[in-house]
Curated annotation (Swiss-Prot):
GO terms under biological process: translation
Molecular function per GO: small ribosomal subunit rRNA binding; structural constituent of ribosome
Family classification: Belongs to the bacterial ribosomal protein bS6 family.
Originating species: Leptospira interrogans serogroup Icterohaemorrhagiae serovar Lai (strain 56601)
A Pfam family reported for this protein in Swiss-Prot or TrEMBL: Ribosomal_S6
Protein name: Small ribosomal subunit protein bS6
Length: 91
């Protein structure tokens, strides 16, 4: 198990749906979330998929590297997630 930070930007129009989809995906791949922060709605620097604003969510979690790869692939397919970034924490 490794520790990761995961940040997502979701569509404003699907705020609750996107958040539940993220949580379901993490649970499905046995990702253990240790901390969760809702950074709120923010204006994007440039439009992403024709969206001017997005909802930012930040998670600290631990998981198997293979599980994180699967989560990232599912996030790419999900239409409610505009962007996501996973960073491995060392230490």
């Amino acid at each position: 198990m490794r520790n990761y930070e995961l940040t997502t930007i979701t569509r404003v129009s699907s705020r609750e749906v996107a958040k539940s989809e993220i949580q379901e995906t993490l649970k499905k791949h046995s990702v253990s979330v240790t901390a969760e922060e809702d950074w709120g709605q923010r204006k994007l620097w440039h439009p992403i998929k024709h969206e001017e604003q997005g909802i930012f969510h930040h998670y600290k979690c631990s998981a198997d590297p293979n599980a994180i790869e699967k989560v990232e692939k599912e996030f790419l397919i999900n239409q409610n997630i505009l962007r996501s970034m996973v960073v491995r924490l060392h230490g």
